């Protein structure tokens, strides 16, 4: 294997979703010689300073430097944090995820991916599909991809859960070519 992506759960994150992410991401990245490993989680209490009591949300950017330290400890190509709490960025009501290509880290939140959040019945399969799309999207950013105008491409920007459900979990041909170029070059 040429490298490794680590998945870092932060707080209470469902094990079945983490296992699905690890298996699915492994299946995709194995052809590039990249192993995907689930590592020991972090306590959410480490991030109390990121919590906005009025909004009842965590400011996503505060997770990224900590993930960067963990990524370096594992000598990994990238680190993906997974939380089960609501996250936001300044100027936005909420976000599904956030990436920092310079630090080679990203975070995704499951909070708004649950069908129950929208008043629909629980659907574990749908939750896992949404989580995979967000993981592929944020890792795409980590590896140098921008947002894509193709609504079916996983790199398409999701303004709402409807956008997430419309897109596939895979990169379009154009984004995939760019990703492959980046993975075999500067990000190795």
From Swiss-Prot:
Domain of life: Archaea
UniProt entry tagged with the keyword Protease: yes
Pfam families: Peptidase_M54
Reported cofactor(s): Zn(2+)
Matches recorded under CDD domains: Peptidase_M54
Record-listed Zn(2+) 2 binding positions: 148, 153, 172, 175
Ranges in a coiled coil: none
Keyword Cytoplasm attributed: no
NCBIfam families: archmetzin
Protein name from the UniProt record: Archaemetzincin
Source organism phylogeny: Archaea, Methanobacteriati, Methanobacteriota, Thermococci, Thermococcales
């Amino acid at each position: 294997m040429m490298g490794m992506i680590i998945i870092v759960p932060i707080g209470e994150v469902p094990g079945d979703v983490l296992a699905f992410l690890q298996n699915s991401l492994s299946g995709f990245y194995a052809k590039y010689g990249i192993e995907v490993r689930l590592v020991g989680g972090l306590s959410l209490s480490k991030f109390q300073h990121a919590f906005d009591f009025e909004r009842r949300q965590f400011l996503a950017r505060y997770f990224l430097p900590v993930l960067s330290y963990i990524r370096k400890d594992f000598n990994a190509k990238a680190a993906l944090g997974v939380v089960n709490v609501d996250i936001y960025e300044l100027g936005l009501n909420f976000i599904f995820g956030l990436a920092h290509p310079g630090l080679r880290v990203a975070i995704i939140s499951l909070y708004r991916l649950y069908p129950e959040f929208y008043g629909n019945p629980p659907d574990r399969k749908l939750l896992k599909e949404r989580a995979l799309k967000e993981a592929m999207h944020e890792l795409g950013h980590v590896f140098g991809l921008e947002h894509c105008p193709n609504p079916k491409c996983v790199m398409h920007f999701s303004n709402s859960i409807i956008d997430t459900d419309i897109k596939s979990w895979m990169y379009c041909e154009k984004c995939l070519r760019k990703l492959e170029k980046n993975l075999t070059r500067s990000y190795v």
